[in-house]
Amino acid sequence: MWLNNFETMKKRTASYQNNEEKPYLHLVDGGLTDNLGLASLLDMSNLLTVKKLYAELKNYNLRNIIVVNVNAQNELSNHIDKSADVPGIKEVVNTVINVPIDKTTESTVKYSQKFADQWNAYTKHKKGAKIKAYFVNLSLKDLPEGQLKNDVLNIGTSFYLPQSDVDKLREAAKILLEQSKEYHKALKALQ
């Protein structure tokens, strides 16, 4: 079953190898799909042991597994703790919704890193070409302190962003990629 799903995924994503036919890739916020989009990877790792999964993937001549997790979790400024006024319904609903999601996100990121670490520990003992796993975790909260960090953490969830917010997020992405050691290791592995 897992092998059939892998073949289906491979066929579905093959067209993205043609940059002229499909020059753009639009991604969906993982929180909208399955909490960071990592759930399917983690489900797969729970169904098969690392040993079985490694053996299956060796059949496809893979050399690297690279997962780039972009955690765009915001931190909207609110000042409810600065006033004796009872918080409004919007503040209460945001708290009730965001706290459990934030905790699940944190747990998923930790589990994903643990999976990559376990995978790489297993492959150290393998002979020949190895399949290395890289888990690149980029979080807006890891930006250096300053106006850009404050601005991007206060961008609300939306299906449309004004160009000024897009520009700030691109600048933030560049900084996060530049400061990520794991990203640079993964990039080097692809060369």
Q: Where on the chain are the PLM-derived regions?
A:
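Soluble non-transmembrane domains of integral membrane proteins
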Residues: 1-7
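C-terminal helical/tail subdomains of lipid-metabolizing enzymes
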Residues: 8-44, 48-191
